[in-house]
Amino acid sequence: MSQEKQVFSIDLAGRQLTVETGQLAKQANGAVLVRYGDTAVLSTATASKEAKNVDFFPLTVNYEERLYAVGKIPGGFIKREGRPSEKAILASRLIDRPIRPLFADGFRNEVQVVSIVMSVDQDCSSEMAAMLGSSLALSISDIPFEGPIAGTTVGRINGEFVINPTVEQQEQSDIHLVVAGTKDAINMVEAGADQVPEETMLEAIMFGHDEIKRLIAFQEEIVQAVGKEKSEVKLYEVDADLNQAVREMAEKDMHSAIQVHEKHAREDAINEVKKRVIEHYEAQEADADTLGQVNEILYKIVKEEVRRLITVEKIRPDGRKGDEIRPLASEVGILSRTHGSGLFTRGQTQALSICTLGALGDVQILDGLGVEESKRFMHHYNFPSFSVGETRPMRGPGRREIGHGALGERALEPVIPSEKDFPYTVRLVSEVLESNGSTSQASICGSTLAMMDAGVPLKAPVAGIAMGLVKTGEHYTILSDIQGMEDHLGDMDFKVAGTAHGVTALQMDIKIDGLSREILEEALQQAKVGRVHILNHMLSVIAEPRTELSAYAPKIITMTINPDKIRDVIGPSGKQINKIIEETGVKIDIEQDGTVFISSINQEMNDKAKKIIEDIVREVQVGEIYEGKVKRVEKFGAFVELFSGKDGLVHISELALERVGKVEDVVKIGDVITVKVIEIDKQGRVNLSRKVLLKEEQEKEAAKEENKQEQQ
């Protein structure tokens, strides 16, 4: 590869995308700087010279955010980037998934792909720049990568598809799709949508693939110009004689074990065969490498037989038909003190989801590279080891948990009511209690049940289903509601979530080169049938959201004040608002447009806080009459509190009908008197009169007396 800087450009959605090679990170196997608008991402690919002694392909993909890219200094005491943000973890997974299938089976050299985001133009996706950069860094390197791949985002505005929509366009779009693939096929899909029909989603995917072909042609030109010759790497292979011997010893028994329908019984039967074969070779004092090869051969026997049964005999490991859903069971309200709970069970997969409602002040604050500063809807997914009957250390969420949580969040967000209609922060936590595949989709179903139990007025209930594929040559079988073994040994994990009206989320991962339009279309239609079946089951448990919130959920009242009065409610250094909070125990959130949200479990305290705020922002009008308490007495008059935070002056001459020598002769501190507003001066000072009201009363009495005399 030439070590001199070279620049290549292409127009992408009306903005220039530029690739620079030969200047930065020259010690990496491959490196490119991708500029898209003002976004700049440095992508590098590095590989170990020797294969690792592992039974898998050790690929690591990192998407690294730097806050200098948006002109920010990290918060906190240390003032440097810490652990990756959720967005960075999701971007790493997004890049990993289309790249991983394009390395040869048996390639065991460690590969690391790193993309550092150095500058961000919000209208030009840094994730898509990083995906293109990662593919190019691998393609121009000497690493044996069978790409390139490319990815693009697709939106839809007023029925028209848009490539790489800007921030403004994304707000108007009802589809948020990321699609990646090779020039021949699609191999990764990630999408959120606002209840969009399957046919439209398929059209959006194919629309994105047309752009992908153009980006791949662009990459091929760059590889032609600056690419290195690919290294000759010896791929891992098991010994042919050993392979034959193990197969003769284990195949028949393994085939019988695989056809045990119950998960744990099947695993025990398979492990018994493995144990017998391993013990045979241990007795012959086989070394660790040989035992490793034996394990790999046994794994291949299982994989081949499972795939043969599915594609040839149309038999699934648990005996179901291809489009059959496992038995369903659901329950709501099983946790008394939570705001809402839903238990969803599908075969041996079980998720318990809990809904918690909070004030708008409980929103999650986001400190990253995006334009979004906070979010009021969250879904978190936990996968403890006991869910699969194993033991392991309990640590924080990993990439998988974060990815599954984000998928559930994306699926449910389109049906969450607006802040105006439901002024709450909503947090969902899905605890996976049993796992045999499709746990992320079970968490979506459980979360829908939990929100309906909590009284969240969803636009429509959402269910999710995971579809699988086993493909051999031109023959393939699409599976509904895949279980763990089918996911592990199959070619596709295609998750589809949505309502009865359309799709709200898609996620597709595949282990083969790519999928055709026909297979995608069939999978989407089969998923729709399964999704509607699951929705009908859920609605038989709870038909609609509860009309009342839990007694333990906060009550929120909304009021609107003049935006100019916000400063009065807050007070200097927050003194006034903190006083209200301390006095009532409520939470208060104020929007810039003057909308005030008051929340507390105690409705009486909510009402009290509202009254205080109303008094603070109330405008005094000339001619209004108040009953107020005398707060202060001076020689020239008395100061009367009309309502909380607002005083007025009754001049000594306005205290009584007769001449007053001393204010104290008429009123003293603590007296409650009725006064009328007679003037508000240019400085906003309120002048009051008691005399005017006394005179009016005197005149009324005189008029009454006169009427009485006339009637006599």
Swiss-Prot record:
It holds the Pfam family PNPase. Residues 554-613 form the KH domain. It catalyses: RNA(n+1) + phosphate = RNA(n) + a ribonucleoside 5'-diphosphate. Mg(2+) binds at residues 487, 493. Its cofactor is Mg(2+). Its EC number is 2.7.7.8. GO terms for biological process: mRNA catabolic process; RNA processing. InterPro entries: ExoRNase_PH_dom1 (IPR001247), ExoRNase_PH_dom2 (IPR015847), ExoRNase_PH_dom2_sf (IPR036345), KH_dom (IPR004087), KH_dom_type_1 (IPR004088), KH_dom_type_1_sf (IPR036612), NA-bd_OB-fold (IPR012340), PNPase (IPR012162). Keywords: Cytoplasm, Magnesium, Metal-binding, Nucleotidyltransferase, RNA-binding, Transferase. Belongs to the polyribonucleotide nucleotidyltransferase family. This is Polyribonucleotide nucleotidyltransferase. The gene is pnp.
